[in-house]
Amino acid sequence: MAVSKNEILETISNMTVMEVVELIEAMEEKFNVSAAAAAVAVAAPAAGAGAAAAEEQTEFTVVMTSFGSNKVNVIKAIRGITGLGLKEAKDLVEGAPSTVKEGVSKDEAASIKKELEEAGATVEVK
């Protein structure tokens, strides 16, 4: 029985972030490809064309560089910000440096940074 694209997309949309990461890794192994190389190849032409036009950055990425001495509070903050489950939030925190959120506004990035720093984490906004 063949599975339709819509069924595959529906299944993936119901997965957690960690499950999607594991799926991507399994696909990379099975098909001997790298998803990162494809993303760089697609993003490279856009970056060259948009560099002159993009004078002011409008989308930011929040990166946690370390969780400091209070890991429990940082995990709680990550769960509140991202909506991740306990295990996924713990894995994200322990995997520092790690991206917390991408493509957020300047105000939202500042708010996330403040919340994580109050919890004890070290955070960068890129």
UniProtKB/Swiss-Prot annotation:
A Gene Ontology CC term for this entry? cytosolic large ribosomal subunit
Q: Which UniProt keywords are present, listed alphabetically?
A: Ribonucleoprotein, Ribosomal protein
Gene Ontology molecular function: mRNA binding; structural constituent of ribosome
Question: Could you tell me the superkingdom of the organism this chain comes from?
Answer: Bacteria
Which PANTHER family does the record cross-reference, listed alphabetically? 39S RIBOSOMAL PROTEIN L12, LARGE RIBOSOMAL SUBUNIT PROTEIN BL12M
User: How does it associate, per the subunit comment?
Assistant: Homodimer. Part of the ribosomal stalk of the 50S ribosomal subunit. Forms a multimeric L10(L12)X complex, where L10 forms an elongated spine to which 2 to 4 L12 dimers bind in a sequential fashion. Binds GTP-bound translation factors.
Q: What job does the chain carry out?
A: Forms part of the ribosomal stalk which helps the ribosome interact with GTP-bound translation factors. Is thus essential for accurate translation.
Q: Give the matching NCBIfam families.
A: L12
**Known HAMAP family for this protein?**
Ribosomal_bL12
This protein is called Large ribosomal subunit protein bL12
What species is this protein from?
Legionella pneumophila subsp. pneumophila (strain Philadelphia 1 / ATCC 33152 / DSM 7513)
Q: Which gene encodes it?
A: rplL
